[in-house]
C-alpha cells in the first residue's frame, strides 16, 4: 500500500502543466501514477518548432551559458561567479553546477546531499537565466523563483536522486519542476548532445516499471505532484564517465540542463539551513514552519550515485 500525503494536500490532474500550458496539445505523458499522485511529461521541441522559441535562440542560450564564458576574469572587478565543480563525498565529479534565485530578495543557497551550492552572483549569468525563465514560464504556465543548472561535458551524466529538499517541501505538498535541455554535439544531428533520462520508483510495488526517455535540444520536461517523494531519476551514464563516450550517441556531446523550482520554505537559521537566514523566511507562516520535518542529513545510499 502506497502511503499518500494528507488529503488536504491533494491536487487534481487538471492542474498539471500538460493540462494547463498554452502548448498542452503537444505534451507527451511519461509517468501518470494516480496512486502516488506523481506525474511527468515531455514537450519535445522538434514537434512544435518555433512554437515558443527557435533553434537559433536555443543555440544562443547554450553558448551564452557555457562554462567557458565564465572563466575567471583578469579584471578583479568583474564578477564571473557562476559555475562550480560538482563533487560527492570528497570526490570530484564530471559535472559543473550553478544555482540562481530569481527573487532579488531571496538569499537562499541550495543544500543537497553533501553539497552546499552558493548562489551564482555573476550579473551576466543571472540575466541570461532570467531571460530564459521568462520564455519557459510563458510556454508552461507556472511562475518559478529559483533555477538549478547542471553542465554535462561529453561522457557525463548524473546518478539516481530525488529533488526532495526542504526548500520546496516535497513531502507535504505537490511540487512542480520544469526542466529545459540545451544540447550541443559533434554534429548537427537530432541526437547531438542528447541524454537518456531514466526514472524508477523509490520503493518497488507490483506493476511498477522503469521509464526511459531521450531528452534533446530544446525539450521541456515536467516532474509534478509528489514525484520527488516517490520517484528517483538519473541521467545516463550516472556519476561515472561513459566507457566509450565518442561512440555512445547519448553522451557524445555536451548538455546544459536548467530546472526551475519554487522555494516555499526559505532558509530560516535552523541546522538544516546551516544557520543561514533568508530575509524572505520572515514571511513564512507558523503553520509551514511546524508542518515540515527536517530531512536526514545523510544521502540515500545508491552506491556511488550522487544527489543532483
Mark where each language-model region is.
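Non-heme Fe(II) oxygenase metal-center motifs and adjacent flexible, charged/small-residue loops
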Residues: 1-308
Amino acid at each position: 500500500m502506497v502511503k499518500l500525503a494528507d488529503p488536504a494536500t491533494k491536487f487534481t490532474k487538471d492542474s498539471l502543466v500538460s493540462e494547463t500550458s498554452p502548448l498542452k496539445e503537444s505534451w507527451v505523458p511519461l509517468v501518470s501514477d494516480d496512486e502516488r499522485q506523481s506525474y511527468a511529461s515531455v514537450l519535445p521541441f522538434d514537434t512544435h518548432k518555433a512554437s515558443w522559441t527557435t533553434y537559433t535562440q536555443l543555440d544562443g542560450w547554450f553558448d551564452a551559458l557555457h562554462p567557458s564564458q565564465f572563466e575567471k576574469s583578469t579584471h578583479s572587478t568583474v564578477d564571473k561567479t557562476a559555475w562550480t565543480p560538482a563533487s560527492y563525498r570528497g570526490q570530484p565529479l564530471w559535472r559543473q553546477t550553478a544555482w540562481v534565485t530569481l527573487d532579488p530578495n531571496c538569499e537562499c543557497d541550495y543544500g543537497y546531499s553533501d553539497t552546499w551550492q552558493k548562489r551564482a552572483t555573476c550579473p551576466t549569468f543571472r540575466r541570461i537565466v532570467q531571460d530564459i525563465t521568462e520564455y519557459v514560464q510563458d510556454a508552461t504556465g507556472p511562475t518559478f523563483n529559483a533555477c538549478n543548472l547542471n553542465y554535462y561535458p561529453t561522457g557525463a551524466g548524473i546518478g539516481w536522486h530525488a529533488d526532495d529538499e526542504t526548500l520546496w517541501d516535497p513531502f507535504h505538498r505537490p511540487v512542480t519542476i520544469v526542466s529545459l535541455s540545451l544540447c550541443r554535439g559533434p554534429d548537427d544531428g537530432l541526437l547531438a548532445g542528447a541524454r537518456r533520462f531514466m526514472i524508477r520508483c523509490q520503493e518497488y510495488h507490483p506493476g511498477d516499471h522503469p521509464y526511459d526517455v531521450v531528452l534533446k535540444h530544446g525539450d521541456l520536461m515536467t516532474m509534478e505532484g509528489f514525484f520527488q517523494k516517490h520517484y528517483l531519476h538519473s541521467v545516463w551514464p550516472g556519476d561515472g564517465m561513459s566507457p566509450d563516450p565518442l561512440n555512445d550517441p547519448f553522451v557524445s556531446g555536451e548538455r546544459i540542463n536548467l530546472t526551475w523550482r519554487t522555494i516555499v520554505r526559505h532558509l530560516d537559521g535552523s541546522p538544516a539551513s546551516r544557520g543561514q537566514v533568508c530575509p524572505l523566511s520572515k514571511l513564512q507562516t507558523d503553520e509551514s514552519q511546524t508542518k515540515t520535518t527536517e530531512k536526514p542529513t545523510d544521502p540515500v545510499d545508491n552506491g556511488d550515485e550522487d544527489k543532483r
